[in-house]
C-alpha cells in the first residue's frame, strides 16, 4: 500500500516524510483491525480507506490557519488523525461522545506515538474550550447551521474559523446560516481517485 499512497500523494501534490507515510499506513492498519470488531467505518477495504479517509482528510491541510484545532464528532479520528500526522506543528483535540471510538483513538495515539492529539469523550455542547480554538473542524458531522449552533463556544472570538468538509456545495445550508456568521472561503477540493465533488466550507463570525 506504500506505493499506492505515494501515487495518491503525488497526484495531490502533497509531500510527506517517510515517517508521516508510515504513520498514515499504520493508522489505516489499526482502523481496519478495530473495524472488524467495533464497526467504526462503513469503508471495509484498506485500499479504499486510503482514498476515502486519508486523502479526503489531508487535502484540507493547506487551508487550516492556526495551531490549535478541534475535530468535533471525530468518529474514528477523521479528519483529525490524518491531519495531525501531516501537521505535526499543530495540536488537535478529537471529540466524540462514544466510548468505543475514544478508546480506539487512544490506542492509535499510543501505537503511533502521536503527541499532538488529545482524544476526549464528551458531547460537543458540554465541552469547555480553554483557551478557544483557532479552528473547529467537522466531516459528516452536522448541517452548517447545527455545527455553528452547537460549536459556537469553541472558536476564538476574532480569528477562529469553522471548517466543514462537504460533498457538493450545500446551497440550502449556506442560505440558512445564523445571523453573525458568514462564508469566509468556499474551496473545491481535489481528491485523487475519489468520485463525486468535495468542498471545504470555511465560516467566520462577523
From Swiss-Prot:
GO CC terms, sorted: cytosol
EC class of the enzyme, as a word: transferase
Keyword Methyltransferase: yes
Organism: Edwardsiella ictaluri (strain 93-146)
Keywords carried by this UniProt record: Cytoplasm, Methyltransferase, rRNA processing, S-adenosyl-L-methionine, Transferase
UniProt xrefs under InterPro entries: rRNA_ssu_MeTfrase_G, SAM-dependent_MTases_sf
EC number: 2.1.1.170
Localization (cell): Cytoplasm
Main location: cytoplasm
Pfam assignment, any one: GidB
Name of this protein: Ribosomal RNA small subunit methyltransferase G
Catalytic activity: guanosine(527) in 16S rRNA + S-adenosyl-L-methionine = N(7)-methylguanosine(527) in 16S rRNA + S-adenosyl-L-homocysteine
Gene Ontology MF, one: rRNA (guanine-N7-)-methyltransferase activity
Primary role: Specifically methylates the N7 position of guanine in position 527 of 16S rRNA.
Binding site for S-adenosyl-L-methionine: 73, 78, 124-125, 139
Family: Belongs to the methyltransferase superfamily. RNA methyltransferase RsmG family.
